Amino acid sequence: MTVDTAAAGGAGRDPRLPHSADTVVVYSDLNCSFAHLAMHRLHEARHRLGLVGRIWFDHRAFPLELFNGSVNDRPGVDSEISVVGALAPAAGWRLWRSPDWTYPVTTLPAMEAVQAAKAQGWLASEALARGLRRAFWADSRCISMRHVILDVAAETSVVEVNELAAALDSGSARSAVMAQFESARAGRVRCSPHVFLHDGMNSANPGITVRWVNGDFGVGFPVIDADDPTVYDPLLRRAAELAG
């Protein structure tokens, strides 16, 4: 966990930081297993600490397909499920069970939908992001597809689906995704997930130390050398202090 106080102050405030003290920024991709784990633990910690309704999660796009110039390889994703999933089974994990040709080739439309849902409030964007993650990781649904995204939105019971559909059709949130990608590749966002607080405190892949053996992502498999799920409590307590 690091603190970058220079980025948090003055006229040159870092755009990667939250706009308000009561929000926690999380840069991530929806089909990143470590981000799925992190978001599950963030939600659990917020509930445990009694901070629901006081601290919000501002989802920012870290599009792996744009960083890598390719689809997030399914062999790599599959190799992570049993390893990362074992750290928090309740998050919802299953190997892909739908036909192979329905595996998501992109998560950009889904990430755009999460940004569009912010117009309806933090509750809506949080619920949609969590629903889309579960749709992919647990339910083997193709979150590349517009109708699947809207179905998931309807299932949240908090997202206004017609409003979201209009935003997707107009592309009103697409520029936000690309702006977040640009800010992420400028240097301070190291990976998916990377968590930022209003004062510059941040943590990349919180609590996890991981390495790949017998090949890189898509060839070998991950080994978790360290896992500390308690790191989320001090992060959220600090966010609550900043929020006042």
Feature annotation, model-predicted:
Residues 1-5, 31, 51:
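Intrinsically disordered, low-complexity proline-rich regions
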Residues 29, 62-64, 200:
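An acidic- and aromatic-residue-enriched active-site/binding cleft used to recognize and process polar
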Residues 18-33, 38-42, 57-60:
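Short active-site neighborhood of thiol/selenol oxidoreductases, capturing the structured segment around
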Residues 27, 38-47, 134-244:
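C-terminal cap of thioredoxin/glutaredoxin-like
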Residues 37-140, 145-146, 234-242:
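Structural alpha/beta surface segment adjacent to cysteine/selenocysteine redox centers
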Residues 2-22:
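A short beta-strand-turn-helix
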